[in-house]
């Protein structure tokens, strides 16, 4: 059983990806350069026979005997690329095959080391004092005007009103005699003015 891959459908791959020396032998198919360690079989049966006889019987595998017809075998091999399990499509002669578990040649490091350091610690130098000075409150008491205390009691006992109104100018049990007489005089003037207006 042979595995054959059409080279014309493959993209152009540079040999520098694998970092190995390319072989001097190269064949160009459809404008794609492929470095190979092995020579392609020339399109004549004699060259194909020499190629087959140059190999030891132990090295001849199913891919070498793909067809009994030499021309058909050459047609198959000329459009095929040798492959192995580790490296996939062998585009270059490589003395060291890539392991299938770690494909280091195809790895691209997308990690970015950012040289940015953000310091989230903020030092706040704000101090709030809740202590209040009481010296001002003492001064405020001194600045307040001291009004004289109003005496509710009358100066003399002669002017005390009774429950019944009297016109003699004397009253009993009256605490606001001065305000009473002032209001009484004002009411008399208002009454006299109303009578005159009528």
From Swiss-Prot:
It is found in: Host cytoplasm. Disulfide bonds: none annotated. It holds the Pfam family Rota_NS26. Its main location: host cell. Keywords: Glycoprotein, Host cytoplasm, Magnesium, Metal-binding, Nucleotide-binding, Phosphoprotein, RNA-binding. GO terms for biological process: viral genome replication. The modification Phosphoserine is found at residues 67, 154, 156, 164, 166. O-glycosylated. Hyperphosphorylated on serine residues, when in dimeric form. Phosphorylation by host CK1 is required for the hyperphosphorylation of NSP5 dimer. It comes from the Viruses. One of its GO terms (cellular component) is host cell cytoplasm. Mg(2+) binds at residue 92. Its cofactor is Mg(2+). The keyword rRNA-binding does not apply. InterPro entries: Rotavirus_A/C_NSP5 (IPR002512). Plays an essential role in the viral genome replication. Participates, together with NSP2, in the formation of viral factories (viroplasms), which are large inclusions in the host cytoplasm where replication intermediates are assembled and viral RNA replication takes place. Orchestrates the recruitment of viroplasmic proteins such as capsid proteins to these factories. Participates in the selective exclusion of host proteins from stress granules (SG) and P bodies (PB). Also participates in the sequestration of these remodeled organelles in viral factories. Homodimer. Interacts with VP1. Interacts with VP2. Interacts with NSP2; this interaction leads to up-regulation of NSP5 hyperphosphorylation and formation of virus factories. Interacts with NSP6. Participates in the selective exclusion of host proteins from stress granules (SG) and P bodies (PB). Also participates in the sequestration of these remodeled organelles in viral factories. Belongs to the rotavirus NSP5 family. This is Non-structural protein 5. It comes from Rotavirus A (strain RVA/Rabbit/United States/ALA/XXXX/G3P11[14]) (RV-A).
């Amino acid at each position: 059983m042979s595995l054959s891959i059409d080279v014309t459908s493959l993209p152009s791959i540079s040999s520098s990806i694998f970092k190995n020396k390319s072989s001097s032998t190269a064949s160009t198919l459809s404008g794609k350069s492929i470095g190979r360690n092995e020579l392609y079989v020339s399109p004549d049966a004699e060259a194909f026979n020499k190629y087959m006889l140059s190999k030891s019987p132990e090295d001849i595998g199913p891919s070498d005997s793909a067809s009994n017809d030499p021309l058909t075998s050459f047609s198959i091999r000329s459009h095929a690329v040798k492959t192995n399990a580790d490296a996939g499509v062998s585009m270059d002669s490589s003395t060291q095959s890539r392991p299938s578990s770690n494909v280091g040649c195809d790895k691209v490091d997308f990690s970015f080391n950012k040289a940015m350091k953000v310091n989230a610690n903020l030092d706040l130098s704000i101090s709030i004092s809740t202590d209040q000075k009481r010296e001002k409150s003492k001064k405020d008491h001194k600045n307040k005007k001291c009004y004289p205390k109003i005496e509710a009691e009358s100066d003399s006992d002669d002017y005390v009103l009774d429950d019944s109104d009297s016109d003699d100018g004397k009253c009993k049990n009256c605490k606001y005699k001065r305000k009473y007489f002032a209001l009484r005089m004002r009411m008399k003037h208002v009454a006299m003015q109303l009578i005159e207006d009528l």
